Curated annotation (Swiss-Prot):
This is FMN-dependent NADH:quinone oxidoreductase. PANTHER family: FMN-DEPENDENT NADH-AZOREDUCTASE 1, FMN-DEPENDENT NADH:QUINONE OXIDOREDUCTASE. Homodimer. Disulfide bonds: none annotated.
Length: 212
């Protein structure tokens, strides 16, 4: 039995290319073992706490090994509960559209919440930063309107580069990427792009969850 946490970053549901490819991955994951479980975190329907003064004060006190106030401790507990939910999975799947060469703001908000000292990373003067989410696979599906891979436009890709940097920072080493591009093209080409990405998702899920 395995638990997959699926983090959905597009609000477009079944109109989203990244979401549709993710569904092919999920179906294959569920076929691998009847006991497998999927938990979906729709970032457009999940209440994320504000990153406000109390939370920031708590964070910096923790970074400096100081005790937070009662209000700061409450804010930190709310954050810690979300991080605990995130870490309570065996593997991960993100579906992400490109917005303005980067990621949707809801996903950035979520990342700012889960990237926490003592919870998903640690720091020491001797060894520097060390990620704490280790030994788990993460698959990221990126949808983008233009062709970025293998073109001059690759320098504008702050979607995949940012996600891989962040995931590596908090400890992931087994990171897999599926790119759905270009989607802003004619209907026939768009369907070919989608079909190719779905097949790639199915093949990867079979490999990760021992269906081959």
């Amino acid at each position: 039995m395995s638990k997959l946490l699926y983090i959905e970053a597009s609000p477009r549901k079944n109109k989203s290319f990244s979401t549709r490819v993710a569904q092919s991955f999920i179906n294959t994951f569920l076929d691998a073992d009847p006991a497998n479980r999927i938990e979906t975190l729709d970032l457009w329907d999940f209440p994320l706490p504000e990153v406000d003064g109390s939370y920031l004060s708590a964070k910096y006190k923790i970074l400096h090994w100081q005790d937070p106030t009662e209000a700061e401790a409450r804010a930190w507990t709310e954050i810690a509960n979300i991080v605990s939910q995130f870490k309570d999975a065996d593997s991960y799947l993100f579906s992400i559209p490109m917005w303005n060469f980067s990621i949707p703001y809801k996903l950035k908000h979520f990342i700012d919440i889960i990237t926490q000292p003592g919870l998903t990373f640690m720091f020491s003067p001797e060894s520097g930063y060390q990620g704490l989410v280790t030994g788990k696979a993460c698959t990221v599906i990126y949808a983008r309107g233009a062709q970025y891979r293998g073109t001059k436009g690759s320098t504008l890709d702050f979607q995949k580069t940012y996600m891989e940097l962040l995931l590596s920072f908090i400890g992931f080493e087994n990171i897999h990427s599926i790119r759905v591009e270009p989607t802003l093209t004619d209907s026939a080409s768009r369907e070919r792009v989608l079909a190719t990405a779905k097949l790639e998702a199915i093949s990867l899920a079979k490999e990760l969850y021992s269906l081959i």
